[in-house]
Amino acid sequence: MKGSVFRKKSIQDLIAATSGEKSLKRELGAFDLTLLGIGAIIGTGIFVLTGTGAVTAGPGLTISFVVAALACLFAALSYAEFASSVPVSGSVYTFTYATLGELMAFIIGWDLILEYMLAVSAVSVGWSGYFQSFLSGLGIHLPVALTAAPGAVKGTFTLFNLPAFVIVMAITYLLYLGIKESKRVNNIMVILKILVVLLFIAVAAVYVKPHNWQPFMPMGFGGVFSAAALVFFAFIGFDAVSSAAEETKNPAKDLPKGIIFSLLVCTILYVTVSAIMTGVIPFAQFAGVDHPVSLVLQSAGQNWVAGIIDIGAVLGMTTVMLVMLYGQTRVMFAMSRDGLVPGSLSKVHPKHKTPYVATWFFGTMSALLGSLVPLDELAKLVNIGTLSAFVLISVAVIVLRKKQPDLPRAFKCPGVPVIPGLAILFCLFLILNLGWVTIVRFLVWLLIGLVIYFLYSRKHSKLNQ
């Protein structure tokens, strides 16, 4: 098995590595996990992609959100089983190494690199839209060429999204210095984000004109499913809950609660917001708009509330970028430590104690992509990366049930293999709705990864030594 691409890290070794001096403190309950999930989920999806989704599906966007939420729920139950039976930090990459072997772990790690890097880029584009909306409220306007990526706004010459570039580089610098994430700060930020969304609902609901909901599905089910594949981005982040397994007081009870409650709260908020948005403004007016939520309020003459929404969106999306870039470096660090990518990526700064090479490299890449590539293209690639990860996790649950039926599982996914099977079908269906261009781009990325694995990673893997 030494040279095999299917060699595995044993689950017992993974769990043993977390005990002793390097074990994490178990202090998170179901409430903390729910807020952690909501904190990671609410961001660009609700503040930005609701506009793009409305153009694709019309008022039927509400159904798109429910379809995307179902795909997430089925995958989430598989995630919860994994997290409770392999309660180790390192997310899907670690789980896959233990169950499906090294090659699949490398592919998922390579997939996560794409997902996290492009997620930071996509969120930075949304952040830029709200930041510029906030500036224009103060009478400050940037040169048009520096407001968006080339080709992002039809009929307008744009060259470079300067605010998107600057915010990612600023966050990269913060992470290079070292940042202590705290439960309290996250909980306060999340409550603030929820309040901003509730404020929008309360103020905008009175301006709804029901005739704007006709026709409900102007592009038919095709439009609804295409939008579901796009707004799936709005739910990315709930997997952050499962990666906190090591720090949860009672993983068996609290993990599934945290995952399901956070998905439920976000789905209700998303459906309500999209119904109000398409009720206030005819859906076609959202074309090319990267601050749709505040646009709705501006059109209703509620400029001061729009300003509050802009600030809330800017703060909310800053935390999402921070967590995503942090997660990116953590996956890279794990892969580098396992010998699958060059050792320099796990180099730790002598003073700041941070993986500084990985931080600066991926921070710069994310900043450039965010400033040069339009948002919907970025979002589609993030989605295909995440959906592929969900498919693999669901397959891994079925495999692990067969291969290791006696493994202690604090939480069991109900209805195996039906529920993981539904997750696989839903996710593959959404992948097909992302369009062939996105699928081909993703396959090219995977092909580059496979070349790297067979030329470098297989030889340098720690399991090979």
Swiss-Prot record:
Transmembrane segment boundaries: 35-55, 57-77, 103-123, 133-153, 159-179, 188-208, 216-236, 258-278, 305-325, 355-375, 380-400, 413-432, 437-456
Reported consequences of knocking out the gene: Mutant is still able to take up isoleucine, leucine and valine. Deletion of the gene confers a weak resistance to growth inhibition by serine. The deletion of the three permease-encoding genes aimA (ybeC), ybxG and bcaP results in an unprecedented resistance to serine up to 100 mM.
Keywords: Amino-acid transport, Cell membrane, Membrane, Transmembrane, Transmembrane helix, Transport
Topology of this chain in the membrane: Multi-pass membrane protein
Compartment(s) where it occurs, according to its Swiss-Prot or TrEMBL record: Cell membrane
Regulation: Isoleucine uptake is efficiently reduced in the presence of 100-fold excess valine, leucine, alanine, threonine, serine, cysteine, asparagine, and a nonproteinaceous amino acid 4-azaleucine.
GO-annotated biological processes: amino acid transport
Induction conditions: Expression is repressed by the transcriptional regulator CodY. Contains two CodY-binding sites in the bcaP regulatory region, which both contribute to repression in vivo and do so independently of each other. A single CodY-binding site is apparently sufficient for substantial CodY-dependent regulation, but both upstream and downstram CodY-binding regions are required for maximal repression of bcaP. Efficient bcaP repression by CodY requires the simultaneous presence of isoleucine, leucine and valine, and other amino acids in the growth medium.
Signal peptide (residue range): none
GO CC aspect terms: plasma membrane
GO molecular function terms noted in the UniProt entry: amino acid transmembrane transporter activity
InterPro entries: AA/rel_permease1, AA_transporter
Entry's family note: Belongs to the amino acid-polyamine-organocation (APC) superfamily.
Role description: Branched-chain amino acid transport system which is involved in the uptake of isoleucine, valine and probably leucine. Can also transport threonine, and is active as a minor serine permease. May be an amino acid permease of rather broad specificity, because several amino acids, albeit at 100-fold excess, are able to prevent isoleucine uptake. Probably does not transport methionine.
Record-given protein name: Branched-chain amino acid permease BcaP
Source species of the chain: Bacillus subtilis (strain 168)
Encoding gene, per UniProt annotation: bcaP
